[in-house]
Each structure stands twice: as structure tokens, then as C-alpha cells.
Amino acid sequence: MHAADMDALLFMSEREFTYFAGFQSNFWQSPTRPWFLILPAEGKPIAVIPSIGKNALSISWIDDVRIWTSPNPEDEGISLLSDTLKGLSKRHGRVGVPMGSETHLRMPANDVVKLKSALGHVDMVDATAILRNLRMVKSDWEIAKHKYICRLVSDAYENFGNIAKSGMSEREILAAHRLDVLSRGADSVPYIVATAAQDGTDDAIRFPNDRPLVDGDVLFIDTGAEIDG
């Protein structure tokens, strides 16, 4: 951050919030309220969140939590966020935000415009490279978690022959496989696909259907499971 002349990094997506704050919640399924996490170039992280998340975030390691009363459609945290960022951006006047591939800003486009206007001479600049380079280096703890979840799903695949039978539908097979993965210790299975067709399938993304599998079908299944975020 110092080399890139950035006073702070601003995150607002579930992945970055979970990675840096260690906080997990199904509340991310609701797009009505944004959550913001700021990493200053110096000092502890700062969370700027709606009031509904105050108690839940208190169990994380983030101890500087600033809240606004929400819902408040006219100002969902923009004033509080801009004031916080301006207070941190007195040296370079630059705040880094992931803007590159595989990133997104989890806030209304109108609020992005409002935030940039409220920041005045503080510029929002792309911090994708900083984030990507950081996450490319895995700690021993992260590697252990990857090994654990990969082994868990591999064991579920080994057991797949005991689950998938001719006459079952893609939907039934998918549900049984998901339950098997969860029963082995996964926290969630947010991505799972099962498609089948005679002599193979060229569709690897659609929802499962209710057609019973018959002899000659080739079943494709893809599983994305999580443990500790």
C-alpha cells in the first residue's frame, strides 16, 4: 500500500470481508444493505456496517466497528463511510478498491457516484493487484483448510456409486450428494451441478431436472464446498 501511495483499502464484497475480518453470515444473501471494511495503511481495520450487524460482528477480531441506523435508503452508510475514509486519506489522498477482473462493488451504482462525490479530492484507485498478490500466498492454516475440504469432497466422490443409481433424477442425485458432503463436515455447498445425457453432456452449468437416469447416460457433477469461509 505504501509503495502504491494508498492510504487505505476499501472492501465491500463477501469474499474480502470474510477473508480479512474472519466474519461469516448468510446475511450476504440480502443485497439491501452494504457492508464496508477498511484496511488503513497504518492501524487496525475499521468496519462500517448497518446497525443490524453490530452484535454479530462483535465476535470477530475487528474492534473498531462504526454503524449507521439502517434501513436508510437515502443514506446507507455513505456519509459515515466517506467521513471515515477522508479521515484516513490525509497523506496520499488515494483509497484502493478492487476494480479488476473477478471483482465487483457490492453497493448501488448511485451510491458509488455519491461516495466519489463525497470524497472530494480523495481518489478511488484500483487495488486488484495488491489483493491478488496477497491472496496468492497461502498460510499453513489456509493450506490445511484446502486439504481438508478437498479430501472431504474426494471421499464423497468415492462414495458416489452408493448414492447415484439408475432411475434417480439429476435433482435427487444432486440432493443426495449435497447431503453426503455436508454430513462429512463441510459448512456449505454453494456450488453444485449435476447434468446427464446419453453418451455425454455438453452442459455444465444448468439446474438439475427430474428426468430419471437410464442405462447409457453419462452423468457430470461438479462440487464447490466450503469450510471456514
Regions found by a protein language model. Give the residues of each.
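A composition/biophysics-driven feature that prefers long, compositionally simple stretches
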Residues: M1-L152
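Active-site pocket-lining segments that scaffold enzyme catalytic pockets across diverse folds
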Residues: C150-F160, E170
